[in-house]
A protein has these predicted regions:
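S-adenosylmethionine
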Residues: 1-429
Length: 429
């Protein structure tokens, strides 16, 4: 397929997403099933266009003075893929599969409208109703934070030191253009792509199949490391999901101690068994029911709550959820988080730790949840992570890190990671 066919496909998929309110992955999969002739490189280019449109939805609609899928796609190709209008015209001229060109008025808008004149939430590509949350949390840098969430994300890998060291893994993966992560001691990074370029499918690499690494954002690696630094021998991963942090904790404990993994949504835990086997882990105990946890109250030195959340910190990778999030959804999530914190606290032994993590950068899901929990549970208090951060990473090397009341916030703008909130609470006798 040439560019014209890829543009036409992206427009078709965006219409499907809008009409049927589908997740982006479902629409891409459905299109691929009905267009089997499309090669892997074509599918990657089409996926890039669709993701870029949803990342920059508001700003693209503003400069084109139109939010129809055709205009949005052309805006991304010209502005973000850096293909000028005249060059694109020549590329599409003889392509039989090219869609109709935008109206002259739309192209005129593209050349005349200046994004700096747009309302700030449009410049930041975030829903207008969330602007106040960003402003209250990040103050003068809120717009930079918002803009950073509309960029492409790199591909981060976590070395599994149970099987290999980072130096050896780096040598085996150097042909992918990897480099060392800037913060995580176990991380390797493949930089974000531009235009039609795609990230490599590293899961096909023999080193992945041998269990030498896991795909894990650097931010997730960092919060896992901060969780493990307490040297707890008994850890409960209360919202284990697919097991990303469970596996990281097992590695950080060098396969010693015991990690219990549980999740209220059993389907989310489906991948964990195969991942545990591939990683060579044998200190993880899986729980399939709430009843199996009941006898373990006040048993754990650390309880990790990687709480279900809005996912605002992952917008670079999942831009469609940005536009599906509503005030009602956020309220429902915060109520769920309150319940989970209360449920998980009963498993923390005296002088133990309750670690609260979200992949959100909204205060409603983060520090406000902590303050609410502490108001109901005075036998817990915030245990500052500043000294531990300095021990692991040296705060002087990361002066922009956002630390509030001893808790930390990671963001694409501050740490070049996904957005995360980390808070460690200590239970007192």
């Amino acid at each position: 397929m040439r560019l014209g066919g890829q543009i036409a496909a992206a427009i078709e998929i965006l219409k499907d997403i809008r009409t049927h309110k589908k997740p982006i992955t479902n629409s891409l999969k459905d299109w691929g099933m009905s267009h089997r002739f499309a090669g892997s490189s074509d599918r990657a280019s089409i996926s890039n266009i669709v993701h870029d449109v949803l990342r920059k939805y508001l700003s693209s609609a503003y400069i084109m003075d139109s939010d129809d899928p055709e205009s949005l796609v052309y805006a991304v190709i010209m502005k973000d893929w850096d293909i000028p209008w005249e060059k694109m015209l020549s590329m599409l001229k003889e392509d039989l599969f090219s869609p109709p060109l935008p109206k002259e008025s739309v192209i005129k808008s593209f050349h005349s409208r200046q994004l700096e004149n747009a309302p700030l939430h449009i410049q930041g590509n975030i829903p207008q109703w969330l602007q106040s949350s960003f402003q209250s949390y990040f103050k003068d840098t809120w717009l930079k934070e918002a803009k950073s969430l509309s960029m492409r994300a790199p591909l981060d890998l976590r070395t599994n030191t149970l099987k290999v060291n980072r130096c050896k893994l780096f040598k085996n993966l150097c042909h992918y253009g990897v480099h060392h992560s800037s913060i995580s001691r176990f991380g390797l990074r493949i930089p974000a792509t531009k235009g039609k370029s795609r990230l490599p499918n590293v899961m096909n690499d023999i080193t992945f199949q041998r269990g030498w690494f896991e795909i894990q954002d650097e931010g997730s690696q960092i919060v896992s490391n901060l969780t493990a630094i307490t040297n707890s021998s008994q850890i409960l991963d209360f919202c284990a999901g697919g097991g990303g942090k469970t596996l990281a904790l097992s590695m950080l404990l060098n396969n010693k101690g015991q990690i219990h993994a549980w999740d209220n949504n059993k389907s989310r835990m489906a991948p964990i068994v195969a991942r545990i086997k591939r990683a060579g882990i044998h200190n993880v105990q899986l729980h399939s029911s709430w009843e199996s946890l009941r006898n373990l109250q006040e048993h754990f030195t650390t309880v990790l709550v990687d709480a279900p959340c809005s996912g605002t910190g992952t917008w670079r990778r999942r831009p469609d959820i940005k536009w599906r999030l509503s005030q009602k959804n956020l309220i429902e999530r915060t109520e769920e988080q309150k319940k989970i914190l209360e449920e998980s606290a009963q498993f923390v032994r005296p002088e133990g730790y309750l670690v609260y993590i979200t992949c959100s950068i909204l205060p409603e899901e983060n520090i406000q949840q902590i303050n609410y929990f502490l108001s109901k549970n005075p036998h817990f208090s915030i245990d500052s992570i500043i000294d531990d951060w300095n021990q692991l990473y040296d705060l002087k090397n990361h002066p922009s890190l956002f630390i509030e009341n001893g808790c930390c916030v990671l963001t694409p703008f501050l740490t070049n990671t996904d957005g995360f909130f980390f808070c460690r609470l200590k239970r007192h006798t």
